[in-house]
Amino acid sequence: MKKLSRTISGVTPVAVMTKPLPCPGKCIYCPTFAATPQSYTPESPAVLRAKSCEYQAYKQVALRLRIIQDMGHPTDKVELIIMGGTFLSADITYQYGFIKDCYDALNGVVAGSLEEAKTINETAQHRCVGLCIETRPDICGKAEIQRMIDFGTTRVELGVQMLDDDIYKLVERGHRVSDVAEATCLLREYGLKVHYHWMPGLPGSSPEKDLALSRMVFEDPRFCPDGLKLYPTMVVEGTILEQWWKEGRYTPYPNGTMTGLIADIKALVPPYVRISRVLRDIPAVFISAGLKDSLRDGVRQILESRHQKCRCIRCREYGHRQRKGQTSGEPTLRRLDYPASGGKEIFLSFEDASDTLYGLLRLRIPCASLPVLGQKYGAKTGLVRELHVYGTELSLGEQGDQSAQHRGLGRKLLAEAECLARDEFGLDSLAILSGVGAREYYRSLGYELVAGYMCKHLD
């Protein structure tokens, strides 16, 4: 049966799980099970799929493609999501081999190297237009970022949890708030999208503190992530936190309190942010205390009762609103500027009068040049960190009356970004850290490949 929401945001997500690996963290809330990747539980859907494939990346990707195609979805534009503990702390040879196997599965042919696999994927039937990696803020330095660029990464999810050093110390997180700020800045300056994992309800916090920190994350320019995964704290079987709960040292928020808090957070999120999840996908049998059921309906009801709306990207996407039967109008170009990590972010979007979001572009005016681009593009270069047109995914070259894709909105957004970079900010070039499978699109618009980036001089 075709699940409409699977490709409704314009791409096909394919989750791939690494083999069980040791994690440098010792967080008291993190589940640890034998023969299961760190932070996951044995019966989670992604874990069960990975186990059936012996945690081999090639088998996992091939299986997911076959299942998604059998469900009637296009698989031309794929976003790979690498899951399973802290991948970047694993053996480096394993990392490169794992990513290569993902591309080989998309390509249907085994390449001689990762670079060859990426080149093949530029024109393959199943193109990787996005690649996401999860990591810790303290395992996100320049060396790790360069490795991610080698992989073709476009989005990084940081395990931030909550921006408070006292909480970090209490839960044995192993890093500081300053590490979050530094990692966020580096990721932005290299042109990557930055999402945070956000955990209200941790030991040492309170609903009031969680809300204040949630407000701060968007008011403090050191942070301002592009997206959030809201993961209310759960007491999971076998964790140190479960022992604290049994001893009375920790009590999770009542369900109503947590649902109200999530509604408060959603109400304050800026329109440039995408909230992709509001609860971790952990089977209820492994949850000793805390929320076990989806929050979306309860949160929506609270917001409606307050006459409030969540303005996040997911709630405003063309495809999601179309599925709900909402009428869409004619999109017009909008612009939102905000400071972040020492530079300037310009959020361009096509939206209608009801704020329905058809497409977006994130333009960064960086605070420093990128040496990896060399003399030709290194100085006075702006960064396009994301270009995305929403609506039900269409196959390459396909047209559809009910989709926002393939109407030229992406080209218009990019043309506007080029004009702004040149005329308003005096930049002479743009660089885009695009997915490998999107490179041909940018080549058609005059961009060339330089050190993993698609670059163009602005005449």
From Swiss-Prot:
State how changing residue 274 to A affects the protein, per the record.
Reduced tRNA-binding
Catalysed reaction equations from the record: uridine(34) in tRNA + acetyl-CoA + S-adenosyl-L-methionine + H2O = 5-(carboxymethyl)uridine(34) in tRNA + 5'-deoxyadenosine + L-methionine + CoA + 2 H(+)
Which cofactors, if any, are listed as required? Answer: [4Fe-4S] cluster
What EC designation does it have? 2.3.1.311
Task: State the source organism's domain of life.
Answer: Bacteria
Q: What is the effect of changing residue 77 to A?
A: Slightly reduced tRNA-binding
Question: Per UniProt, what does mutating residue 193 to A do?
Answer: Slightly reduced tRNA-binding
Which InterPro entries did the record assign?
Answer: Acyl_CoA_acyltransferase (IPR016181), ELP3 (IPR039661), ELP3-like (IPR034687), Elp3/MiaA/NifB-like_rSAM (IPR006638), Radical_SAM_C (IPR032432), rSAM (IPR007197)
| GO biological process: one example | tRNA wobble base 5-methoxycarbonylmethyl-2-thiouridinylation
What would changing residue 73 to A do, according to UniProt? Slightly reduced tRNA-binding
Q: Which residues form the signal peptide?
A: none
Q: Give binding positions for Zn(2+).
A: 310, 312, 315
Query: In what residue span(s) does the Radical SAM core domain sit?
Result: 6-271
* Oligomeric and partner information: Homodimer.
Return the protein name. Answer: tRNA uridine(34) acetyltransferase
> What is the organism field in this record?
Dehalococcoides mccartyi (strain CBDB1)
